[in-house]
Amino acid sequence: MKKHSARVAPLSACNSPVLTLTKVEGEERPREPPGPAEAQAPAGTEAGGRTSRHNWTCSQERLKKVFWGVAVVFCVCASWAGSTQLARLTFKTFDAPFTLTWFATNWNFLFFPLYYAGHVCKSTEKQSMKQRYRECCRFFGDNGLTLKVFFTKAAPFGVLWTLTNYLYLHAIKKINATDVSVLFCCNKSFVFLLSWIVLRDRFMGVRIVAAILAIAGIVMMTYADGFHSHSVIGIALVVGSASMSALYKVLFKLLLGSAKFGEAALFLSILGVFNILFITCIPVILYFTRVEYWNSFDDIPWGNLCGFSILLLTFNIVLNFGIAVTYPTLMSLGIVLSVPVNAVVDHYTSQIVFNGVRVIAIIIIGLGFLLLLLPEEWDVWLIKLLTRLKVRKKEETAESSGDLGTGPQSRSRRARPSFAR
């Protein structure tokens, strides 16, 4: 298998630690070996100056990533919460969730053109779109994107993508946006369970706890509104959407591995092409069977449809390519922060009741989501941190006791000459 640099997995809506399943698969740049001067660490002011300059550069880079992270978190939160609320608003006048799914997925075609525009602006070595396309097609194998590869490695993901979005949008018709957004956060727990079973990922007890919390939150959310038909169906739809998304990510890791930014953009554009070619017939059938019917095309809220599509496209662009400028964990926070945003909007625009059971369920699912953001070596880091704090406390205690011990001795030494007189 060929190696890639600057990797990112598509549809990173709830990957772990952000959005790359269970491992950070952002830019996998090997750490450069230290130079001779740094390796030998020469004594003197020169070595100290180099160390201070190196630390200053590292701190600047980290600070820059944090600032970018705040911007990315805001974009993820705003686009995800905005698309959810706009979909709910659209269904008041246009009751066609599958048609909305089809329309928004068509916009995936823009991924590769947008990526190429960024490549032309940023890259020093300019390539034509055809050259860049051929290079990215190597991701699918030595023969590139053949008809067989299209139907075996792209079509299944196109179906999963459509199911994920359709079930999510259909659930918004049944239950409020707050419940939908928080239940979709269980996606990370499902990814962990599937990757543990299928991909043989490392077992982590804290992630098992997170999965248990997610399941408990689903049960409590069902109990919050009572076991009414609309509530149960809506919750089942969201859980199904989260499951389809988790299956999408795990299968992508299993069959395709991870991709460069250009390869991911090409893959997502291919999903848009698949949607146009093979999914278009379904909205047509639903229209003529009056399952999703509207009187005239003038009744379609085109502004809402385009706004939802732009927000969803922005959400996926930021999640898939934001890893180039910030930490994956910061990006994931935008997903969970969209829950309180939806809660505030629902409080003022709908008749949602935040009873004790619903609030506890939201907290439990959110806690499980945050536990899945912990890195694999979090326990080692925690032990090191506690050890450092313990050593520092001992040093401070020793220094304070030393100061108390030297104080009387110094005073007695100063007092001795006066007694000698």
Swiss-Prot record:
Catalytic reactions on record: thiamine(in) = thiamine(out)
InterPro entries, alphabetized: EamA_dom, Solute_c_fam_35_mem_F3/F4
One Gene Ontology CC term in the entry: membrane
Any Pfam family the entry gives: EamA
Membrane disposition: Multi-pass membrane protein
Location(s) in or outside the cell: Membrane
UniProt KW Glycosyltransferase keyword: no
Name this protein carries in UniProt: Solute carrier family 35 member F3
Regions of compositional bias (Low complexity) in chain numbering: 37-49
Residue spans crossing the bilayer: 66-86, 98-118, 149-169, 179-199, 208-228, 232-252, 266-286, 305-325, 326-346, 352-372
Regions annotated as coiled coil: none
Region (Disordered): 25-53, 394-421
